[in-house]
Amino acid sequence: MIELNAVSVEKSGAPILNDISLSFGQGGITALIGPNGAGKSTLLHAIAGLVAPTCGTVRVEGLDMARARPPERARHVALLAQDERVTARLTVRDLVGFGRWSHHHGRPRDADRRMVRDALDIFDLNPLAERRLDALSGGQRQRAFVAMAWAQETPWLLLDEPLSALDPRHARDIMDRLHALTRPGPAQRSVVIVLHDLGVAARYADRIVALKDGRLVTSGPRVLAMTGGMLSDLFGTGLALERIKGRDVVVPV
């Protein structure tokens, strides 16, 4: 379970998050939505333990993330940051294993190699395994980064705008794979993802956390929380949720 209790974050005296309290259990996809500057990335980094709250607590499976040591945090969450930076000379295989090997001084163990093989299989990366990152398309590269996060074998995947540079086809491919990984089974993970595309949130999210100006607007199951009225208030423009061909679609009104 992820639990935030009265969490506020300030930067240079300016409030970024203001008195956020919410909780949700494992399973499914939780989408963080809201306008630019709402505090979504800061909230995700606070959950990962990389941003310490000015006040309040963040707990993941009972662990106080601000007080925990990095190895303790790494057993609970894997964060894929928006500006993830690694050398372009890495191969896909090396990238996927990078998050595991870094925990024990770069020396892979048999369990690490097995996990990398599983990740390459699950994300259909075997044909690209020995290719360098600078030889990949944007969609292939992002799929490799998500596989790297999955291979860290944590119950929670925290993804900061992983679709931002992708065309609709590659974005849909990533989300289809994430959706499949949240279903029960040995590969199951729980996903918390920052999304700007409301249509993607409407289609894939099980839960919605909506932020505006650093404050929590609503949090809950998508079918209850993601309403046209809430979206219009959140973004300051007329939006509605319509059912089209069996899917919820966000449309302007």
What residue spans do the PLM features occupy?
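The feature captures the beta-strand-to-loop junction immediately N-terminal to the Walker
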Residues: 33-35
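Conserved ABC ATPase "signature" region
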Residues: 97, 110-128, 153
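Conserved ABC transporter NBD signature motif
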Residues: 56-64, 73
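Catalytic Walker B motif of ABC-type/P-loop ATPase nucleotide-binding domains
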Residues: 157-161, 166
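Conserved structural motif at the start of ABC-family nucleotide-binding domains
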Residues: 2, 17-19
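Helix-to-loop junction immediately C-terminal to a conserved catalytic motif
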Residues: 48
